[in-house]
Design a protein with these regions (language model features):
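Sec-dependent N-terminal signal peptides
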Residues: 4-14
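Sec/Tat signal peptide C-region and signal peptidase I cleavage site
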Residues: 16-20
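N-terminus-centered regions that define maturation/targeting leaders and the start
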Residues: 21-185
């Protein structure tokens, strides 16, 4: 009985290793654990460059038909957080967004990829800009593997509605977290 238990535990452990090698992942060559002035928003009292970070993802689950990217600050003093970036209808054959792809004027994403309204009221990337002295804010950047080619939404759709559609169509998601704060001047 002891040998059977050991065998089962061994199989579970090694099964976990093989699964972890195929885990859906998100990474960035631009972000460490701390956002910088490069990503910081330009406006709302912030004076950053407002460049979206490079993002790449790997090992999407079988059945993935498209991707979406979101950037969200759960620490924003709004009662509902703050959506900084909402990108969807990314083709399933893509696995990267280059640095500054969130600048809709540069056309760094393929036609058909939609960058909709953020909580700043703009389309495209709106970088971190926490209130001065509010402490460290957490920024969750997430790639969603979707079971549909398109969400059927447009660039004027607000983040909450996009989030609802993502919730209904996500097969898997992977996230990275970055932090940012602004001290009192």
């Amino acid at each position: 009985m002891k040998k059977i238990s050991l065998l089962i535990i061994t199989l579970i452990v090694f099964s976990g290793v093989s699964f972890s090698q195929n885990t859906f992942t998100l990474s960035s060559t631009d972000l460490g654990g701390q956002a910088t002035k490069t990503e910081e928003f330009s406006g709302f009292g912030c004076e950053g460059e407002n460049k979206s970070p490079q993002l790449s993802w790997a090992n999407a689950p079988e059945g993935t038909k498209s991707f979406a990217i979101t950037m969200y600050d759960p620490d924003a003093p709004t009662g509902s957080g703050w959506w900084h970036w909402v990108v969807f209808d990314i083709p399933a054959n893509m696995n990267e967004l280059v640095t500054n792809a969130g600048n809709i004027n540069l056309n760094l994403v393929p036609k058909g990829v939609i960058q909709s309204i953020t909580d700043y009221g703009i389309k495209g990337f709106g970088g971190p800009c926490p209130p001065e002295g509010h402490g460290l804010h957490k920024y969750e950047i997430t790639v969603h593997a979707l079971k549909t080619d398109t969400l059927g939404l447009d660039e004027n759709t607000n983040a909450a509605v996009v989030g609802f559609y993502l919730w209904n169509n996500t097969l898997a998601k992977a996230s990275i977290v970055s932090y940012y704060k602004r001290d009192n001047k």
